[in-house]
Amino acid sequence: MLKMAGMVPVGATLVEAVGLLQRGGLDCQHGIIDWVRTFGYGDVAKYTLDYPLGLSGPALGILMNRDAWKNFTPEQKKVHVKYGAWLSAKMAIGNFIISNEEALNTVVKDKGVQLVKVGSAFDAIPENYKKVQRETNIATAKGFGVQDPAVIIDYYEQAVERWRPVSKQIGRDIDKFTEVLVREVFSKIDPDKL
């Protein structure tokens, strides 16, 4: 998608990006707004695009080593699944929404970062990319031996559409999101089968 917007993607760590931005080795950096505050990008990068370009990292509430999981008692597994729902909700709303808005307000006020509105012509870029991304993901999955990746992608896209109205009802309520995650996802998990 970045190429479609006229950008040239390069690989650099978050820390390396600071020096590259300072020396002109990078013109821009794709990531969450909180990085502008936490990594000091706001000292040199004075503009941020007011347009959602997608998630730059995993929104997972719990990651664990399989051996550690297997060594848990059934009760410990249940506790982790129970609080995994809350942690997922807290990360999604607290980190990816609220914390990023607070970071934006901070860097605008303290660092002089300007929020740049994009024209409606930019809307076509993510839409066109969805088609390219689908084909790329299908080819990549087939390369890993997935038999029919289009079915998985279709199911995922249907799930996203099913969750859109639910998300609007939840708003920014972490407890409400936790309840929905428990009902729709976590209550269907059998910890002993993980």
For each of these PLM feature ranges, what is it?
Residues 1-194:
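N-terminal secretory/targeting leader peptides
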